UniProtKB/Swiss-Prot annotation:
Record's cofactor remark: Binds 1 FAD per subunit.
Gene label: GLR1
Cofactors named for this entry: FAD
Protein name: Glutathione reductase
Organism field: Eremothecium gossypii (strain ATCC 10895 / CBS 109.51 / FGSC 9923 / NRRL Y-1056)
Described function: Catalyzes the reduction of glutathione disulfide (GSSG) to reduced glutathione (GSH). Constitutes the major mechanism to maintain a high GSH:GSSG ratio in the cytosol.
Pfam family, one: Pyr_redox_2
Lineage: Eukaryota, Fungi, Dikarya, Ascomycota, Saccharomycotina
Residues at which glutathione binds: S31, R38, Y121, R347, K422
EC numbers for this chain: 1.8.1.7
Binding site for FAD: S31, G32, E51, T58, C59, K67, A137, D331, T339, H469
Length: 480
């Protein structure tokens, strides 16, 4: 006689041969995929979302959310050092050397917060009527989506519309002996202990943010960059201010350098990092933050989805891939790797596919998208950089307004942090085509100005706004 469990397994195995059909099938449970699936289901579309890891994607699990929590801790460490200058904690000997950060305890709290968000994502899917399948999806040779569950059973799916929203993953260097002794940017969030000495390879926003976090929490921080500045994709004003201030704050920036090889002491576990012209010894942790690539283990070639030279899925302005009925958005297309962009694109795609007639032509606008870097201090950018504006309009047709100052908060402090705002205007009407800001609160400040720039504001519009005093942001509407 068969036991109940054996009968269940036989039935389950048989069921896995069935092909389930949906109106909308989403591969990837990150921000873009979840947003698109929920919007589609709200219109009554029979929707299924497939995800093999934790819901929330890079942003929730190994990106924006846990990174910002770490940034808060590092920022607070900076603020605590300012307490005495503001008449507080006079009886306490506070110094950077004496501040102790409990990495392990805080990481546990951070991870618990992330797990709560995972649960919220799952409940929100259920609330909208989206079927959630935990498993790994790939296209089979018949054009179906085949899902392998954690117990290794498989299921097959088809759909009228399929969205690829699988996100990206960190790039690791090739051809560098000992590179495996380091961790990628995802691995940062798996560190169980705070390293006393860290080397970070990379100059982008991830490397820059990690460097700020480590340094603020008391780790001896080294960052290896190929050029003279960090954040080389941002406006030169941001590059210069952040690089200079990091050096002032004690971050060791190794410019025009690259890692050649890495050695590990078998007894101590310490690393020796060999650069082109110098050696960094007694390193506790090496972090590779040199870029990201599309996560595409879904066999897109089986359904004819075209990939670009960099491995990203090629899409048109409506998120259509080269295969009819299959779409892609988010990090996997490599356009703007920002969570809010993926969310907006996902919702607009669902509106176009399943929404009312007036939404059938919707598409995501990728112009004037604000972005920020949670460095120390923060930096924010929207629109064209100065070199981009010159290239588009000609140097004679743009005008730059900028100011550099010390925010009022630092008037009581010996330790100063810079603030710089730069407004780029084009044409005789002086339309604002770029805004680049560095300083405390830049992330919050930029959101409101982003609305104005998106609406086509001119310098005169900015000037017509009465300033809020005393604030740093008032400088943006009083630039001369």
């Amino acid at each position: 006689m068969l036991r109940c469990r054996e009968v269940y397994n036989i039935c389950k195995g048989a069921m896995s041969n069935e092909v389930k059909h949906y109106d909308y099938l989403v591969i990837g449970g990150g921000s873009g995929g979840v947003a698109s699936s929920r919007r589609a289901a709200s219109y009554g579309a029979k929707t299924v979302l497939i995800e093999g890891k934790a819901l929330g994607g890079t942003c929730v699990n190994v990106g924006c959310v846990p990174k910002k929590v770490m940034w808060y801790a590092s920022d607070l460490a900076h603020r605590l050092l300012h307490a005495r200058d503001y008449g507080l904690l006079q009886e306490v000997d506070i110094s950077k050397e004496k501040l102790h950060f409990n990495w392990k305890e805080f990481a546990g709290k951070r991870n618990a917060y992330v797990e709560r968000l995972n649960g919220i994502y799952e409940r929100n899917l259920a609330k909208e009527g989206v079927e959630y399948v935990h498993g790994w999806a790939r296209f089979n040779s018949e054009g179906q989506v085949e899902v392998t569950r954690p117990d290794q059973t498989t299921e097959k799916y088809t759909a009228d519309h399929i969205l690829i929203a699988t996100g990206g993953e960190p790039v690791l260097p090739e051809g560098i002996p000992g590179a495996e002794y380091g961790v990628d940017s995802d691995g940062f969030f798996r560190l169980e202990e705070q390293p006393k000495k860290v080397v970070i390879s990379g100059s982008g926003y991830i490397a820059t943010e990690f460097a700020g976090v480590f340094n603020g929490l008391g780790t001896e921080t080294h960052i290896v960059i190929r050029k003279d500045h960090v954040l080389t994709k941002f406006d030169p004003s941001i590059q210069e201010i952040v690089t200079e201030h990091y050096e002032k704050e004690g971050v060791n920036i190794h410019k025009k350098e690259s890692i050649q090889r890495v050695e590990k002491d078998p007894n101590t576990g310490k690393l020796t990092v060999h650069l082109s012209g110098k050696i960094i010894e007694d390193v506790d942790q090496l972090v590779w933050a040199i870029g990201r690539k599309s996560l595409l283990g879904i066999a897109p070639e089986n359904v004819g989805v075209k990939l670009g030279e960099t491995g990203h899925v090629v899409v048109d302005e409506y998120q259509n891939t080269s295969t009819k009925g299959i779409y892609a958005l988010g990090d996997v297309v490599g356009n703007m790797e920002l969570t809010p962009v993926a969310i907006a694109a996902g919702r607009k795609l669902a509106n176009r596919l399943f929404g009312p007639e007036q939404m059938r032509a919707q598409k995501q606008d990728y112009d004037n998208v604000p972005s920020v870097v949670f460095s120390h201090p923060e930096a924010g950018s929207i629109g064209l950089t100065e070199p981009q504006a010159i290239e588009r309009y000609g140097k004679e047709n743009i005008k730059i307004y900028q100011t550099k100052f010390t925010a009022m908060y630092y008037a009581m402090l010996e330790d100063k942090s810079p603030t710089k705002y730069k407004l780029i205007c084009a044409g005789p009407e002086e339309k604002v085509v770029g805004l680049h800001i560095v300083g405390d609160g830049s992330a919050e400040i930029l959101q409101g100005f982003g609305v104005a720039i998106k609406m086509g504001a001119t310098k005169a519009d900015f000037d017509s706004c009465v300033a809020i005093h005393p604030t740093s942001a008032e400088e943006i509407v009083t630039l001369k």
